[in-house]
Each structure stands twice: as structure tokens, then as C-alpha cells.
């Protein structure tokens, strides 16, 4: 029988640096308003009553996290992350070995809406595999010629989706798929790709396109706009 309305643990891989932000400070520690991007991302998870624990995987040399209020939050656990995202996620999964379902959320994705999170969590009522938040591709997509800045051809956008986070899976299934994929040298770009590698087909749960990941300098102002708009809407 599929699990129904069980408590959920979350893993946030936050050991990366994000060199495309062109800043000495890791992007998850840049501020939007009076909170860091990481705090916005984690608080969005903790705002849902089913999320009882968040494991944050940080770099072993990270001295910034200890200065945040999150460091003393009773629902937060910190573990050492690895060189790659998958290594950090596996470290987080080890810390929640008894959890049945886990969310994995980007440390630099601060604009998660509660209605999107609720719809993603609801799939645990009927799914044995899990799924991800995703946004349908609306722009015309071009594939470039290998090694060149020239168009090779237009890619049919029907059935193309932008993968977002959180991604939500049974803990044991995700652990086993990540472990197998890494052991066999598969290229893992997100958690869903590990399940795909092992022959599973996670669900696509349509989410809002403003659930952006802060990757480049211009993303910071856009994320601030989205967060400010959400705050104003909640107060209205």
C-alpha cells in the first residue's frame, strides 16, 4: 500500500560554491532582505506541517552556516557534504535512515510556493516512485552545434519540462538508485536522473515558473522581486 500523509524529511545540499555568481561568497549565503538565500529556501520547507526535519549538507570547511539562526533550529541537522551534489544528498539520506519519504531541495532556490509544495507532497498518497516539481517549456528551444555557438536545429518543445525542486521520493528507493548510479559511473544531474537511470519514471508535478534557482548575478534581483511580491500577497 502506498504511504499516506506520513511525516517527511528534507535534504538540502548546500556544499557547492556557485562560481557563475562571480562572487567570493557562496551563493546560498548571499542575502535577500534580512535572510540568506539558504534561509529562505529552508524556511519554505519548514513552513509545511508534514516536513518535520531538514538535513543541510555543507562543505566541511564552511564557517558561515554556524553564524545563522538556522544553526540552532531544533528541526535542523547538519552533515558534511561531498564533492558532488549526489554525494551530499547521500550524506543527508544517511542522517534520516528511518524516514520513508524525503524531499531534496536546492539551497539556492528560495522562491518555493506552499501550494506547489503541498501538491508535490500529496503524490505520496498514490505513488511508489515519487516525482518532481517541473515547469513546461514555453520558449522555442534550439540545440547548438557541438563546440560552436551556432544553431544545429530546433528542438520540439512538446513534452519538454524544466526540472525544478523540491524532488520527492521514497528514501530507500532514492538511496539505492543514487548509490547504483554513482557506482556505475552514470551522469547524475538531479535526483530524478538517478531514478531514471534505474528504470523508474517519476511523476511531473507542474510548479510555478517563478520557483527559480539563483545561479547568475541577475537572478538575485529577480528572486528578491518574487519574494517581495509573495510577502505582499500574503499580507493582502
UniProtKB/Swiss-Prot annotation:
Catalysed conversion reaction: 2-C-methyl-D-erythritol 4-phosphate + CTP + H(+) = 4-CDP-2-C-methyl-D-erythritol + diphosphate
Positions of transmembrane segments: none
Site feature location: Positions MEP for the nucleophilic attack: 157, 213
Annotated site residues (Transition state stabilizer) in this chain: 20, 27
UniProt EC number: 2.7.7.60
Protein keywords: Isoprene biosynthesis, Nucleotidyltransferase, Transferase
Record-linked InterPro entries: IspD (IPR001228), IspD/TarI (IPR034683), IspD/TarI_cytidylyltransf_bact (IPR050088), ISPD_synthase_CS (IPR018294), Nucleotide-diphossugar_trans (IPR029044)
Keyword Nucleotidyltransferase among UniProt keywords: yes
Any GO BP annotation: isopentenyl diphosphate biosynthetic process, methylerythritol 4-phosphate pathway
Pathway membership: Isoprenoid biosynthesis; isopentenyl diphosphate biosynthesis via DXP pathway; isopentenyl diphosphate from 1-deoxy-D-xylulose 5-phosphate: step 2/6
An MF annotation (GO) of this entry: 2-C-methyl-D-erythritol 4-phosphate cytidylyltransferase activity
EC supergroup of this enzyme: transferase
Domain of life: Bacteria
Entries under Pfam families matching the protein: IspD
NCBIfam families in the cross-refs: ispD
Similarity comment: family membership: Belongs to the IspD/TarI cytidylyltransferase family. IspD subfamily.
Xref: HAMAP family: IspD
Free-text function comment from the UniProt entry: Catalyzes the formation of 4-diphosphocytidyl-2-C-methyl-D-erythritol from CTP and 2-C-methyl-D-erythritol 4-phosphate (MEP).
Assembly information from the UniProt record: Homodimer.
Protein name: 2-C-methyl-D-erythritol 4-phosphate cytidylyltransferase
Amino acid at each position: 500500500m502506498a504511504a499516506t500523509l506520513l511525516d517527511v524529511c528534507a535534504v538540502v545540499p548546500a556544499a557547492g560554491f556557485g562560481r557563475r555568481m562571480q562572487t567570493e561568497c557562496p551563493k546560498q549565503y548571499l542575502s535577500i532582505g534580512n535572510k540568506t538565500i539558504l534561509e529562505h529556501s529552508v524556511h519554505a520547507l519548514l513552513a509545511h506541517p508534514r516536513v518535520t526535519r531538514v538535513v543541510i549538507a555543507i562543505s566541511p570547511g564552511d564557517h558561515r552556516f554556524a553564524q545563522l539562526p538556522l544553526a540552532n533550529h531544533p528541526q535542523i541537522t547538519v552533515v558534511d557534504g561531498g564533492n558532488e551534489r549526489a554525494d551530499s544528498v547521500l550524506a543527508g539520506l544517511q542522517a534520516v535512515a528511518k524516514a520513508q519519504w524525503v524531499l531534496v531541495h536546492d539551497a539556492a532556490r528560495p522562491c518555493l510556493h506552499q501550494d506547489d509544495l503541498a501538491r508535490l507532497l500529496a503524490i505520496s498518497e498514490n505513488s511508489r516512485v515519487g516525482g518532481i516539481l517541473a515547469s513546461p517549456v514555453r520558449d522555442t528551444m534550439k540545440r547548438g552545434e557541438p563546440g560552436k555557438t551556432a544553431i544545429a536545429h530546433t528542438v520540439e518543445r512538446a513534452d519538454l519540462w524544466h526540472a525544478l525542486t523540491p524532488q520527492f521520493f521514497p528514501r530507500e528507493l532514492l538511496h539505492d538508485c543514487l548509490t547504483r548510479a554513482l557506482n556505475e559511473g552514470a551522469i547524475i544531474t538531479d535526483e530524478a536522473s538517478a531514478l531514471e537511470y534505474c528504470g523508474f519514471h517519476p511523476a511531473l508535478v507542474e510548479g510555478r515558473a517563478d520557483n527559480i534557482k539563483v545561479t547568475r548575478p541577475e537572478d538575485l534581483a529577480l528572486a528578491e522581486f518574487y519574494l517581495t511580491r509573495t510577502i505582499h500577497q500574503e499580507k493582502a
